[in-house]
């Protein structure tokens, strides 16, 4: 457990870093500039981070774990509203970071990693549910659903979270239900031709 002073120092550095990341790319953020913005000395920064990339990596790691916790066991159906809503609430709780993440200088690599959190579990589940559909169809559908969800979330973030979280969750669940109904129809069509 960190002591309170260390926690406050890290929080100041994280908040200042995220603020700077909204304004410029990471390779243009110096440790000196960050420390001045956070009103923290460089020695304190280096006691916790190797460089700004290390700081970003640690922030991403924390958010990634929170998203993983929210995503686990999510089956991407309309009936899975509570889990989808948990993901959306996690994004809302990480509002400042997500603002930077979806901004001009955000980490597209991090977003891609988030999209892959559940790919194997979901496509395995779909293989059992839709045994006559090929892997390309299932993987393409997964990508469509996750990237579509990400687009909805990005629009929500970029519009300053103007809609309630449960509205966004329901929109995503409705999209999933429509896509899964299409997969079900494809499954029945392929099975009927056998």
Annotated model-derived regions:
Residues 10-18, 22, 27-31, 36-39, ...:
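An amphipathic alpha-helix adjacent to DNA-recognition modules
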Residues 71-97:
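Hydrophobic alpha-helical connector segments
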Residues 29-30, 99-101, 165:
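Short, hydrophobic secondary-structure boundary micro-motifs
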Residues 19-26, 73-75, 94, 125, ...:
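Basic, amphipathic alpha-helical hairpins
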Residues 2, 8-12, 16, 137:
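N-terminal positioning helix adjacent to the helix-turn-helix/winged-helix DNA-binding module
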Residues 155-194:
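C-terminal peripheral helix-coil segments that are non-catalytic and often amphipathic
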